[in-house]
Amino acid sequence: MRGKAVSRFLSIVVLLSATSWPGSVAAECLQYGVVNLTGRLVQQTYPGPPDYESVTKGDEPRVIWILQLDRGVCVTGAASSYPSAYSEREIQLVLGTDQYARAAQYAPYRHLVGKRISVTGRLLAGGARYEKRFVIAPNEIKRARTRP
């Protein structure tokens, strides 16, 4: 009788683990490519030339736009050369060819800084060129509905 109970318990554990991990995690992960994300649009300042160390010590301030997500997301890469992450909360927005918010492409959206927005665009690896691990090149940026 005890052997049956242990066998039943092990069967349940195997069944639960097979259905809840890693399949459910993978199903909730974003893939590189076109995505739709919602969060708050914020600005962050980083030091630029000449030393790339401190704005307060004279380095040029470089302002970037960040989409702070409502909740952390998982990002998985199709190849090992693309970074993966769990619970990523910040994605850098890049409009046009300039990642810094001084470019003319940013002007039509300045009124959205500090607001909740919805962004549809191409999710890309940030790499060394950008301040954040992931960037989104938006096709559409619009004000999001307020959360219930």
Residue map of PLM features:
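Short nucleic-acid-contacting surface segments enriched for D/E, G, S/T with interspersed K/R
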Residues: 101-119
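OB-fold/S1-family single-stranded nucleic acid-binding modules
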Residues: 69, 126-148
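Structural detector for short beta-strands of small beta-barrel domains
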Residues: 32-63, 68-75, 121
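Short boundary/loop segments of OB/S1/cold-shock single-stranded nucleic-acid-binding domains
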Residues: 25-33
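Short, structured beta-strand/loop micro-motifs enriched in basic residues and often containing a Trp
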Residues: 94-102
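Bacterial N-terminal signal peptides that target proteins for export
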Residues: 1-11
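Acidic Ser/Thr/Pro-rich low-complexity disordered segments
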Residues: 72-91
